[in-house]
Amino acid sequence: MVRTYWAVIIACLSLGWSAAQTRELVLFPFAQGAAVQPTDEFNVNVEALNALYAQLKEIPSVYVLRFRETNPSITRAIEENRIRRDRLNPPFNEREADGTWRAARVGALLDVDLAFAGRIEEFSYDPTKREAIITISGDLIDVRTGEVIVSVAESGRGRLGSDQEDVNIARIAAVAEVAQKVGAALRERLAPPVQQPTQPQEERRPDRKRERATVTLFAIILGAVLGGSQF
């Protein structure tokens, strides 16, 4: 019975410690630049968010949630006039009139630690090269301090194979590549690789035999010198 009691206590403490170490990150919808090629059959904003979300949720000790205007905390803030509805649209990585990042302001309403907001700068498909390209820029922002932890700008490309005709295959490949690059850049700041401690070199034991031989040789030489000096 006592063992069970202590096991429960330890499990609760461990769970609490783990939760305390986990940071929450909100992922905002992207704004779109003028170089985004419109297409009806491929929603690049949704696809890019899905791909990046899949990358970010693999970062250790980071819990990722997507921004939704229907979140109860956001709904309550609108009802209490703590934020206007028109401030809930991208771009989120722009500063408000008071100098705060919009992403940080909205993130504070969600009570999260981090926010990532950005823009799809370019998205197009070249039928001549049979290639899709996408460029995404963005900022990882500390919601508590309002500081930018890291800014990123990455591109991804996808090309159709010789036997492929569906252009969305190239688009999906391009989105996957850029999401992987952005995710890697954020992972590097949020969960840097642990450096393995260098192996200490073994302390070399003194060679007693060599020491004794050296002392003996020195004594013989010294004796010969002293003996010769007597004549």
Identify the meaning behind each predicted range.
Residues 14-16, 81, 191-192:
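Short, flexible coil/linker elements and helix-boundary hinge sites characteristic
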Residues 26-29, 64, 115-117, 150:
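Structural recognition of the beta-strand scaffold that forms the well-ordered cores
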Residues 1-2:
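N-terminal secretory signal peptides that target proteins for export/translocation
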Residues 7, 88-94, 146, 158, ...:
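Hydrophobic transmembrane signal anchors and adjacent membrane-proximal interface regions, especially
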Residues 20-26, 32-35, 48-50, 55, ...:
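C-terminal/domain-edge helix-coil "capping" segments
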Residues 38-115, 181:
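N-terminal segment of the mature soluble domain
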Residues 5-16:
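Bacterial N-terminal signal peptides
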